[in-house]
């Protein structure tokens, strides 16, 4: 049982780290298709989505 709690604590600590390379750009959007050309212009890759009215791009 101690091993389970140890693994659980390690998992929680690792999940708190920001390991992703996502980039928020200051572009307003109403849907994810609006972000694709803006992400292509900003980071060179058309991979992103609209979150809370702002574009989030993934390199």
From Swiss-Prot:
In this chain, the site described as Basic residue of the functional dyad is at: 49
Signal peptide start-end: 1-22
Which Pfam family is an annotated match for this chain, by its short name? Toxin_2
Q: Specify where it is mainly localized.
A: secreted
- CC per GO annotation: extracellular region
Pinpoint the site Aromatic residue of the functional dyad: 58
Alphabetized PROSITE patterns for the sequence = SCORP_SHORT_TOXIN (PS01138)
Keywords from UniProt, A to Z, are: Disulfide bond, Ion channel impairing toxin, Neurotoxin, Potassium channel impairing toxin, Secreted, Signal, Toxin, Voltage-gated potassium channel impairing toxin
Q: In which tissues is it expressed?
A: Expressed by the venom gland.
Q: Which GO terms describe its molecular function?
A: ion channel inhibitor activity; potassium channel regulator activity; toxin activity
The cross-references to InterPro entries, in alphabetical order and at most eight, read: Scorpion_toxin-like_sf, Scorpion_toxinS_K_inh
Please name every pair of cysteines joined by a disulfide bond in this record. Answer: 29-50, 35-55, 39-57
Tell me where the transmembrane regions lie.
none
- Where does the UniProt annotation locate this protein? Secreted
| Record comment regarding domains | Has the structural arrangement of an alpha-helix connected to a beta-sheet by disulfide bonds (CSalpha/beta).
Annotated family: Belongs to the short scorpion toxin superfamily. Potassium channel inhibitor family. Alpha-KTx 04 subfamily.
Chain's role: Potently blocks Kv1.1/KCNA1 (85%), Kv1.2/KCNA2 (91%), Kv1.3/KCNA3 (89%), Kv1.6/KCNA6 (94%), and Shaker (97%).
Q: What is this protein called?
A: Putative potassium channel toxin Ts23
């Amino acid at each position: 049982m101690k091993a389970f709690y140890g693994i659980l604590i390690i998992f929680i600590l690792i999940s708190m780290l920001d390991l992703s390379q996502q980039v928020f750009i200051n572009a307003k959007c109403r849907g994810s298709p609006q972000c694709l050309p803006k992400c292509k212009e900003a980071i060179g890759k058309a991979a992103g989505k609209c979150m809370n009215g702002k574009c989030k791009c993934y390199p």
